[in-house]
């Protein structure tokens, strides 16, 4: 199951990014829902929200280490709960998708743009970002629901 999630996530990310590269040009949006949702091409040379701009070697190195650690944990420990396996698989697939961009282009292709007229603009992102975010949400749910959570008294 884990390998299927990882491979499908990478394929979905690559196909959508290749579409964005071929179909969109910088500054030319495809409006899907007026004043709310469009596709807008962006070459992100940093990480989330543009942090670590032009630090590709650092970002590539950190990403590779994180992927290897997550894969080691995912595939070595066969007794991991299903939600943890899915969570890590989603995060790994998204991390690999953006890693491919960083190595191939020296930037990450972003193209999904939510906004409200000209007043609110959510940062432009891609499918790999969605996979990492969904995986992280599932990981948080797993941590919160894990047995013994109440005994940790984190919030007391």
Curated annotation (Swiss-Prot):
Active site location: 110, 129
InterPro entries membership: Peptidase_A8 (IPR001872)
Keywords on record: Aspartyl protease, Cell membrane, Hydrolase, Membrane, Protease, Transmembrane, Transmembrane helix
Example of a GO cellular component annotation carried by this entry: plasma membrane
One Pfam family named in its UniProt record: Peptidase_A8
Annotated localization: Cell membrane
Reaction equation(s) it catalyzes: Release of signal peptides from bacterial membrane prolipoproteins. Hydrolyzes -Xaa-Yaa-Zaa-|-(S,diacylglyceryl)Cys-, in which Xaa is hydrophobic (preferably Leu), and Yaa (Ala or Ser) and Zaa (Gly or Ala) have small, neutral side chains
GO molecular function, one term: aspartic-type endopeptidase activity
Role description: This protein specifically catalyzes the removal of signal peptides from prolipoproteins.
HAMAP family on file: LspA
Protein's recorded name: Lipoprotein signal peptidase
């Amino acid at each position: 199951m884990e390998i299927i999630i990882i491979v499908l996530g990478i394929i979905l990310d690559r196909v959508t990014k290749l579409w964005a590269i071929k179909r969109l040009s910088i500054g030319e949006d495809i409006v899907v829902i007026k004043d709310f949702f469009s596709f807008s091409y962006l070459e992100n040379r940093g990480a989330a929200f543009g942090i670590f701009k032009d630090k590709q070697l650092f970002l590539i190195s950190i990403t590779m280490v994180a992927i290897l650690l997550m894969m080691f944990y995912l595939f070595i420990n066969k007794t991991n709960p299903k939600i943890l396996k899915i969570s890590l698989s989603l995060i790994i697939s998204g991390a690999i998708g953006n890693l491919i961009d960083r190595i191939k282009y020296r930037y990450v292709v972003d193209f999904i743009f939510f906004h409200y007229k000209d007043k609110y603009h959510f940062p432009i992102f891609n499918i790999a970002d969605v996979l990492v975010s969904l995986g992280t949400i599932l990981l948080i749910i797993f941590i919160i629901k894990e047995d013994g959570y109440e005994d940790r008294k984190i919030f007391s």
